[in-house]
Amino acid sequence: VDELEQEAIRYNPENRCYLCKHYLFGKLLEFARDHGVTQVLDGTNEDDLHVYRPGRKALREYGVISPLAACHVTKTEVKALAAKYGVSVAHRPSTPCMATRLPYGAEINYDVLDRIADGEAWLHTMFGAEENLRLRVHGDMVRLEIAPERMGEVLEKREEMIAYLKKLGFSYLTMDLEGFRSGSMDEKITQKEETK
């Protein structure tokens, strides 16, 4: 399944997450029916219920069950259970959809997604695989979100970072003084929702 073949998703509207989940789970349910599977589950957890997750609407429309959320299991508890049972990704930081690195309305393409993934992977080699960080792309500018306590280290490594990220095709490099924030591209949307 190639989500970017869908023009409505590729042009990254504010409801992109809903459109994408609707498309993906539509295909998954079609596959499930073809193979005699009557129920599909997903990994939504309790924490997801308290943040902006427009894709959950598609899951409800399709009748997808979210057992972790239903049992009030949090992301921290999921990671603890994964570690207890030796699941290899137990200590990996969360990896949300790469489209969340782009502002709404910016066209999504594999070139920019690959460059973001490359840049984030490289930064993880510098700051640790478990470090929560994001590269947010605004045209030819990239904005690094990282924990405030790591910002001094970023400045110490800036020459190396400038060289690598410019090699990836980013012309302007900035660091977000607010630090890492999950869902920072949704802040304007959630502010709009709160004022309704």
For every predicted segment, state its role.
Residues V1-D2:
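ATP-dependent adenylation/pyrophosphate-handling site
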Residues E5-V89:
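Active-site adenylate/phosphate-handling loop in enzymes that bind or generate adenylated species
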Residues N12, R16, Y110-D114, E149, ...:
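Alpha-helix N-cap and loop-to-helix initiation/capping positions
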Residues C17, V64, M98, M185, ...:
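Short clusters of hydrophobic/aromatic residues that line enzyme substrate/ligand-binding pockets
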Residues Y52-K57, E107, Q191-K196:
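Short, electropositive alpha-helical surface patch
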Residues A121-K196:
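Peripheral terminal appendages
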